[in-house]
Each structure stands twice: as structure tokens, then as C-alpha cells.
Amino acid sequence: MKKLLFKLFFALAFTSISLHGQEKIQQVEFSSFGGRALYSRHYTINFLYKEFEAKQVMGEPAELPKKILQLNPPDKWRVFTKKINLDKFKKLRDGPSEQTVDGQDEVIIIKTDKKTYRKMNAYSNDHDREVWYDLLQIIAKEFGKKGIYE
């Protein structure tokens, strides 16, 4: 009986430790800016809302969707965060700035209950590129788009 209680105690203790150690995603952001782009884009998704904002940087005044703000139902937020592999995102390596050759820099920021992770242009090799573009696809679908560049 003592052995059973001992095993049960340690099983509960290890379960508690492993559940306590998991980070919970609080917010995901994507921004693109710089280069010869006519406007910069910023997407924000959290458990309360989804937001898209475009700011014109240069060129002729254009009709842009300046700001879109939608409520984010809790069930959709749970589905969204389950699609994101935070461990893979943490391992991405920042790439060099694209603005040096008139390109746009892209930044993804994931805020958790414990830490904020920021990655810029993290698509320099095949593995990183796959993780990066998969995450961009997940973000785009939240806004009803086929791709983030649409």
C-alpha cells in the first residue's frame, strides 16, 4: 500500500511539474516594413481580438484597409495556438536585414505568459524557412487570406 501511495505521489508531482513548465501563448504578431514597399503591415492576434493595420510609407495616396479589428472567440484562439509549435519557433535563427538591398524586413513576435520571442527574417535555411512560412500561413488563415502576402 505504501508503495502504491509513493508511486501515486510521484506521478502527480511529475505531472504537475510538466504542466506548470509549459508556456502559454498570449499573443502573436507579424510585421513587415522597410525597403521599397508602399506600406507597412502589422498583424496582431491574441485571445481577445485579431487586428490588421496598414500604414502607407511612400508613393501616391492609396486606398488601403487602414485597420481591421475583429473579436476573437476563445474556441478559435485555442485552435489557433495549438497549431503553433513554440519549440520550433524558439530555435529559429534571425536572418540579415533585407533593407540593405531595398527589401522588406519581416518580424514575428510570440508573447507567452513567461517570455517574449522575436524573430526577424528567420528563413535562411530549409528547416527555418519551412517553420517560418508555416507560421505565416497560420496567421494569414486567421484573417481569411490564402497567404500573408495577399
Regions of interest found by a model, annotated:
Residues 37-42, 64, 102-105:
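Short, surface-exposed coil-to-beta transition loops
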Residues 1-24:
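Bacterial Sec-dependent N-terminal signal peptides
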Residues 46-52, 64, 73-74, 90, ...:
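Short, low-complexity, polar/charged sequence segments that are solvent-exposed and flexible
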Residues 55-90:
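A short-motif feature that recognizes glycine-rich, charge-decorated loops
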Residues 19-56:
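N-terminal export/targeting and maturation segments
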Residues 41-43, 65-67, 115-120:
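Short beta-strand segments
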Residues 5, 21-35, 81, 90-150:
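Short, well-ordered, aromatic-rich surface patches in folded extracellular/luminal domains
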